[in-house]
Amino acid sequence: MADAGKKKLVQQEELRRLMKAKQRRSCSKKRIESPLAKYNSLGHLLCVVCNIQIKSELLWPAHILGKQHKEKVAELKGSKANISSPSNKVQLHHIMKRKGSEPENQESKRIKGTEDQPTALKTKLPEGFFETEETSSAKHAAEKAPSLKLLAGDYEDDDEVEGEEYENVNEASTSLQKPAEIPLPPPTSSADRLPADFFESKMPLVSHSGSVLKADIQEKIVERKDNTAEALPEGFFDDPEADAKVRKVDAPKDQMDKEWEEFQKEIRQVNSVSDAIVAEEDEEGRLDRQIDEIDEQIECYRRVEHLRDLKDTLQDAKMEVLKSKSSKKWQEEIGSDDEETLPSLLYKNWRDKGAFL
């Protein structure tokens, strides 16, 4: 018996150990792989956005679809957008700086290029390069001029920059056309001849004038003010009226008055409904009482008619009895009169008798 008990204990311990191992394996398989999920040292699942511990991996989809998680994500996105988008004033300041420094860099680069061109032409320049260079440089200058006008806002400086660029382009084209008689290798692809960012301008394009930019800045400032007023929590200020004014909410007294009026309105509605129900019940009760009274009157009329019928039958029976009694009495009276007259006739004299006969 002792051996059997030990075997059972051993089997239970093995089963428990196997169940725990199975649970661990299932937990390890169900680990959440998400940038918003994180596991601590104890292996508990945490939400990075909400900073909340999730009890189980099965609850992770429900937590992601929850209202609190979505609000936190939206707040983070809004703050990130506000941080990543600099003000237009800073952009214009950088643009003005770049505008002053770019012509100098371009002039230095062009001077260096003209000095190194006699050696480079022997190996790199293909046939027809000068025509393509002139057309591409003219197009690039024509595309760059309006962008500089929009970015800077100073039209006189833009005209000077355009004039310098056109003069530099003409000088470069004339200097390149002189050694055109040198034998050149076969033409190569345009990707080898031009740099990768030749047609791209690193300066951001502005699609509106300065006045429109100022209006956009003012709108953004107003929106941010509204967002800050809405973001303030309830009770941020000690004075409840000031707190309600900043948060653009009704004051506590006004709110209490509104709630009291709503309460009174609801009470009146409930009272009107209850009065209507009571009136309906009273009307139904009155109709029921009238119906009962009518039924009772009908029953009383039936009883009266029945009693009348009984009275008539009794009267008829009484009349018959009286008639029978009167007829009997009359007959008795007639018989008694005959008996009395007979002896008187017998005792009369014969004369009278004969005369009588």
Swiss-Prot record:
Zinc finger (C2H2-type): 47-69
Cell compartments where the protein resides: Nucleus; Chromosome; Nucleus speckle
One Pfam family here: zf-C2H2_jaz
InterPro entries assigned: Matrin/U1-like-C_Znf_C2H2 (IPR003604), ZNF830-like (IPR040050), Znf_C2H2_jaz (IPR022755), Znf_C2H2_sf (IPR036236)
GO biological process, one term: cell division
Keyword Flavoprotein in record: no
Highest rank taxon of the organism: Eukaryota
Comp. bias (Basic and acidic residues): 99-115, 242-255
GO cellular component: chromosome; nuclear speck; spliceosomal complex
Chain intervals for the UniProt region annotation (Disordered): 98-126, 157-194, 231-255
Coiled coil regions in record: 279-325
Single GO molecular function: nucleic acid binding
Biased composition (Acidic residues): 157-168
Entry keywords, A to Z: Cell cycle, Cell division, Chromosome, Coiled coil, Developmental protein, Metal-binding, Mitosis, Nucleus, Zinc, Zinc-finger
PANTHER family, per the entry: ZINC FINGER PROTEIN 830
Function: May act as an important regulator of the cell cycle that participates in the maintenance of genome integrity.
Full protein name: Zinc finger protein 830
